[in-house]
């Protein structure tokens, strides 16, 4: 498990087991557990973990907001319809080209969907590299992704 996964696991644990009122409080609890991070990193982690501040009576605290799998699928379909430029399989990888500025959004959605064939996503400004274990898994992943493309996407290819 890498540092980020370890940190995310600890953050989820702290949020579910204790009442955290502020980012600073969460940052202090992480530090007590041996993890020192900047406020910017903590903010990114909280966004990736779908942590939201909720009000309960006079109390405000953070909770994890569950986003259903179908909601992620809906988002992927929406992005595929509006921003997909190219989807191409290359050996054990898939190249997903997007409109400028949207590749990281695709990567976040794919990561959240936890498609079993995807080992990692690496995204720049307009390109998302999807890495799979081998060629067969890349083909299976490509098939899965093609279900979310608009009907006209492959018609001229």
Curated annotation (Swiss-Prot):
InterPro entries: Arg_repress (IPR001669), Arg_repress_C (IPR020899), Arg_repress_C_sf (IPR036251), Arg_repress_DNA-bd (IPR020900), WH-like_DNA-bd_sf (IPR036388), WH_DNA-bd_sf (IPR036390). Coiled coil: none annotated. GO terms for molecular function: arginine binding; DNA binding; DNA-binding transcription factor activity. Pathway: Amino-acid degradation; L-arginine degradation via ADI pathway. GO terms for cellular component: cytoplasm. It is found in: Cytoplasm. GO terms for biological process: arginine catabolic process to ornithine; protein complex oligomerization; regulation of arginine biosynthetic process. Keywords: Arginine metabolism, Cytoplasm, DNA-binding, Transcription, Transcription regulation. Gene3D superfamilies: 3.30.1360.40, Winged helix-like DNA-binding domain superfamily/Winged helix DNA-binding domain. The keyword Transcription regulation applies. The keyword DNA-binding applies. HAMAP family: Arg_repressor (MF_00173). Regulates the transcription of the arc operon, involved in arginine catabolism. PANTHER family: ARGININE REPRESSOR. Belongs to the ArgR family. This is Arginine regulator. The gene is argR1.
């Amino acid at each position: 498990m890498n540092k980020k996964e370890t940190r995310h696991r600890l953050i989820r644990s702290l949020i579910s087991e204790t009442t955290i009122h502020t980012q600073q409080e969460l940052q202090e609890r992480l530090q007590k557990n041996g993890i020192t991070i900047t406020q910017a990193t903590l903010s990114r982690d909280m966004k990736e973990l779908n942590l939201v501040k909720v009000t309960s009576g006079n109390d405000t605290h953070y909770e994890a907001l569950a986003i259903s799998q179908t909601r992620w699928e809906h988002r992927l379909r929406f992005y595929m319809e509006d921003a997909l430029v190219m989807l191409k399989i290359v050996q054990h990888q898939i190249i997903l080209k997007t409109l400028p500025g949207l590749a990281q959004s695709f990567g976040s959605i794919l990561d959240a969907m936890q498609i079993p064939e995807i080992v990692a996503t690496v995204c720049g400004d307009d390109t998302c590299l999807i890495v799979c274990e081998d060629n067969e898994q890349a083909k299976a992943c490509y098939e899965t992704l093609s279900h979310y493309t608009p009907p006209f996407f492959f018609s001229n290819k």
